[in-house]
Amino acid sequence: YNKGCAATAMTGIAATLLPFGKTLHSWGGIGLAKGDEEEILSKVRRNKKIREQWQTVELLIIDEVSMLTAELFEKLDYVARKVRKCDKFFGGLQLLLCGDFCQLPPVGSSEYCFQSELFMENIDCYLLDKIFRQQHDTQFQNILNDLRFGVLNTRNRELLKSRIVT
């Protein structure tokens, strides 16, 4: 564990899979993030431990980033700039955002974080396009690639059914 790095996720289940992981909401001290930017900032400033976390962390990892809304992304940027007293993007904090935007969407009908202008202007995206876990099973790789985009043809459906053990 390194105090300069915070490992967070958008859900509690995903956070348990990270070393010393917490939900982004818990780590950031933002609760449900209801209210405007100033209300959330006030909540963070009132908690010395949380405030110090924001001020000292150098790298913030956010897993399951596909569940992060554009609105929350922008609120967090505001909080980071104010608490860290730095007008750079996220107060100069480095972000490592992990996830697949074809998987879990933000809750409700909210916009994805990548739909924020702030995201588009400040985040470099890297597509990981090599499958390692199923590298010797090209048939299964093809099924996974199709399923990622919500496609399940008859041939693949039958193949998956044939692997059911009763």
Which residues does each PLM region occupy?
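Conserved ATP-binding/catalytic motifs of P-loop helicase motor domains
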Residues: 1-166
